[in-house]
From Swiss-Prot:
This is Coiled-coil domain-containing protein 177. Residues 210-221 have a biased composition (Pro residues). Keywords: Coiled coil, Phosphoprotein. Residues 1-11 have a biased composition (Acidic residues). It holds the Pfam family DUF4659. The gene is Ccdc177.
Length: 706
């Protein structure tokens, strides 16, 4: 739940900017978005410390930012955090959830597809009912946590605006009493939430706290500036009291939890009452001084530059440089290589401390993961048992429905068989009477037409009545279904089953009505079709005879027209041939005239082109002679200049080679000294394998050859 800053706090309650419990981001309680994956949590944790820096920088020069304060952007640099399905949230929201005994993950919305995927045997209607029940429960919990969070915000504002002096003592006493009551009342919620895997940022925050009693020391209740001081002097005093002579600075394990402890000590002590939230009580299996003991409550992480500039690191580097000078007899080591050696030593110290912290945190995380696995297994077993019960009930209902449907189908098949037998009997009778009824075809056709019209009108009337009845029944079923759905949201699973039975009964009645209407319609259509076919057969025979006579007349008329068109086409073709021959003769005469004119023009063009070619050749010969003389003169000048430049380059190259040899000797000496210093640092910080020793021997041999 995101913790927005109220208008009163923006105006004067906390002048340091937005509060520190915006240090982490999460799914808001009043937002209905989907659950964030671990990658979004990681990005939120990377962006959250930047929010935590805002109060220090928003003072406008009243308080100087400490250059020793650094943020830890590697809260999720572990394999366990990659698959985490939990999100970070603000301290107010966490405290509200703890007071209401609600896990933060229960406030996240779940998609309907997740419920269907978890129980593949359930029908979509059952999954929808479960989803609605889950959403109603989630919204109720969300409203409860939201109200509790508003109550916490009012308590904080009341505590912030409490006047200093004697009147502040009762307020501080009541605040401590409420904090102790909160810690006692939320012990069950702490125990329940401890079974869940904690988010990586909160895990790192708990890892940095040395002991639970150290976190329960709040500053004076009336001094807000004491809780928010981040000056250089206070940070220096904290660092001097926290760091020993062996470790020049603590590792980069910043967490927003320590910043929250400085600003909200009552809530920090309430959270400390949960025994599963501290990792400092875990034993150190390696037998080395634990990194958790090096970071007290008010300590801050320091950069690699702070570690490299510590006096112990500088003395260590000086000792290595003196040792290399004494052993190798080389010149002094440059300042840059001294800094590199100091950084190597500082990085080794930082990695060692970070490994110890991660080992302790991983042990705590593994315990919480095992507890979460056990809880998930129990829930899965309960879910499977409920699923098996639902599956058995569903199988019994399906079997009962299948038997009922089989009986209905057998009854319908028997009725269809009887109807088919009756229709077959009528067809045989009609076939026997067909010879007798052929003479009365005209009268029967008229009578059949009248009967068919009457039957069609009756069919239309019955069909419209059936449709109206179906619509009324469907509307009735829809209203009943809406009423049952409204009642089902108020009642439980029993009423859902009754609704299903009523729905299936209504559907069965509608299905039977549709079947009866369809059978009656098919019967009527079959009788009407038979009578219409007999009438259309007689009309078709008469039409066929008329068509035969008409087709013979059309064929005779078409033959006469085609003969007339053939004579006309032959005359037109002869006339067109004569015109074409005359046109070809005219074209031949015009082509001869054009050829004579073109030959004359081509002869004149050839003579003119020959004259131009002779003149162009003479001009090119004169230009070639002039260019040849100019090229010879330029070549002589270039040759003389090239000889002079070669002489100057030879002199310059000899001078540069002498300077290069002297600089190379100096650089090799410095490189040997730097190399030996770094090797000394590596020998003290790293373990040497056989392959590393072989490579070092080869490198020494190549340096000695140089």
């Amino acid at each position: 739940m995101v913790d927005p800053v109220p208008e009163e706090e923006k105006e004067g309650a906390e002048p340091g900017g937005s509060e520190g419990d915006e240090a982490t981001a999460s799914e808001p309680p009043d937002a209905q978005g989907a659950q964030q994956p671990a990658a979004s949590s990681a990005s939120a944790s990377a962006a959250a410390p930047r929010k935590a820096e805002v109060p220090c920088g928003a003072e406008g020069g009243r308080r100087e930012q400490s250059p020793l304060l650094h943020l830890d952007l590697f809260n999720f640099a572990c394999p366990e955090a990659e698959g985490s399905r939990y999100v970070l949230t603000s301290p107010r929201s966490l405290e509200a959830c703890a007071r209401c005994a609600v896990k933060p993950v229960e406030l996240l919305p779940r998609a309907l597809a997740d419920l269907v995927r978890e129980a593949p045997g359930r029908s979509m209607r059952v999954a929808t009912g479960l989803y609605e029940a889950y959403e109603a429960e989630r919204l109720a919990k969300l409203q409860q946590c939201r109200a509790e969070r508003e109550r916490i915000m009012r308590e904080e504002k009341r505590r912030l605006f409490t006047p200093k002096g004697p009147a502040a003592a009762p307020a501080s006493a009541s605040a401590s009493a409420s904090a102790s009551a909160l810690s006692g009342g939320s012990s069950s919620s702490c125990s329940s939430s401890s079974s869940l895997p904690a988010s990586p940022a909160s895990r790192v925050a708990r890892r940095t706290s040395p002991s639970p009693p150290a976190r329960s020391r709040p500053p004076p209740a009336g001094s807000r500036t004491g809780r928010k001081s981040h000056s250089l002097d206070s940070l220096s005093r904290r660092r001097d009291g926290a760091l020993s002579s062996e470790s020049g600075a603590s590792s980069s394990s910043y967490s927003g939890e320590s910043l929250r402890e400085l600003r909200w000590p009552p809530r920090a002590s309430a959270r400390n009452s949960c025994p599963a939230g501290s990792a400092s009580s875990a034993p150190n299996p390696l037998g080395r001084p634990s990194a958790l003991a090096l970071v007290p409550l008010t300590a801050r992480s320091f950069s690699l530059g702070d570690l490299s500039h510590s006096p112990q690191t500088a003395q260590h580097v000086e000792r290595i440089v003196r040792q290399v000078r004494a052993e190798r007899g080389l010149r002094g080591v440059p300042e840059r290589d001294r800094k590199i050696a100091a950084l190597m030593l500082a990085r080794h110290q930082e990695e060692r401390l970070l490994l110890e912290q991660r080992a302790a945190a991983h042990g705590q995380w593994e315990q919480q993961r095992v507890r979460a696995e056990q809880r998930r297994e129990r829930e899965e077993r309960e879910k499977q048992r409920a699923l098996e019960r639902g599956r058995r009930a569903w199988a019994a209902q399906v079997e009962e429905r299948r038997g009922r449907r089989g009986r209905e189908e057998r009854e319908a098949a028997r009725r269809r068989q009887q109807q088919c037998e009756r229709s077959e009997e009528r067809r045989r009778e009609l076939a026997e009477r067909q010879g007798l009824l052929r003479r009365e075809r005209v009268e029967r056709a008229a009578r059949d037409d009248r009967l068919r019209k009457l039957q069609q009108e009756q069919n239309l009337k019955q069909r419209e009545e059936g449709r109206q009845e179906g619509r009324e029944r469907a509307e009735l079923v829809r209203r009943e279904r809406a009423q049952r759905a409204a009642r089902a949201r108020e009642r439980q699973e029993g009423q859902l089953q009754r609704e299903k039975r009523e729905l299936s009964r209504a559907e069965r009645a509608r299905h039977e009505a549709l079947l009866r209407g369809r059978v009656r319609q098919q019967q009527e259509e079959r009788e009407g079709l038979r009578s219409s076919l007999e009438a259309s057969l007689g009309r078709a025979q008469e039409n066929y005879e008329q068509l035969q006579e008409q087709r013979a007349r059309e064929l005779r008329e078409r033959a006469r027209r085609e003969e007339l068109q053939g004579r006309r086409a032959k005359e037109a073709a002869e006339r067109k041939e004569r015109e074409h021959q005359a046109h070809l003769e005219a074209l031949a005469r015009a082509g001869e005239r054009r050829l004579q004119h073109a030959a004359q023009v081509a002869e004149e063009a050839v003579q003119q082109k020959a004259r131009r070619v002779v003149q162009t050749r003479l001009e090119k010969e004169r230009a070639q002679r002039a260019n040849k003389e100019k090229v010879e003169r330029d070549e002589d000048c270039r040759r003389r200049e090239l000889l002079q430049a070669i002489g100057r380059k030879l002199e310059r190259s000899e001078q540069l080679s002498r300077e290069r040899r002297s600089a190379l000797e100096s650089a090799r000496s410095t490189a040997r000294a730097s190399f030996h210093v770094r090797e000394k640092v590596r020998e003290e910080t790293n373990t040497r394998s056989f392959d590393r020793m072989v490579r070092e021997a080869q490198l020494h041999a190549s340096l000695d050859r140089k």
